[in-house]
Amino acid sequence: FGYFCMSLIMTSSPLHMHLIKKFSLFETSIAIQLHVVGMFLPSLISGDLVKRFGSTKIIYVGVTIGFFSIFVNTMFDHYYTYVIGLISLGIMWNLLFISGSSLLVISYEEKDKFTAQGLNDFIVFSTQGIGALSAGFLLYYSNWTIINLICIPFLLMVIFVSFLSSNNKSI
């Protein structure tokens, strides 16, 4: 669900910033470029953080950063807050993707690894596609705040499933 939220907000943000808030294409592109840095730069340490603190704790940190991104995106209306919101969205995605991937490899038996990976990839990229393809439609028929708020129940589900899996090692 982290991929869905990231894709939904990331895809709608340049439309919102340029067409609705009238930021220049240059400003909008810089914001997206910094978001991409936020997505991938943490990879230098996120694997080590998962090893040191465990996947579940890093998932909780990622979700917290996601809530921070939603807060910044919905409560403030300045160029730099869009940049901060997008960078934190990228960091959220990174932490959820890395920690979720590390949980996946320990969650199935060896004989099921290809099926588990295939099913995971199908779910992850389907939700990502839904987020990306629905962004323009949702922005047109609602607004920036609603797009961000849509992600809250998905992040709450991530917390719930992570809590269940940390209390039941067979999940």
Regions found by a protein language model. Give the residues of each.
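Structural signature of the two symmetry-related core transmembrane helices
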Residues: K57-F71, I152
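Conserved extracellular-gate-facing transmembrane-helix segments in secondary transporters
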Residues: F1-M10
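Paired small-residue
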Residues: S69, Y80-S88
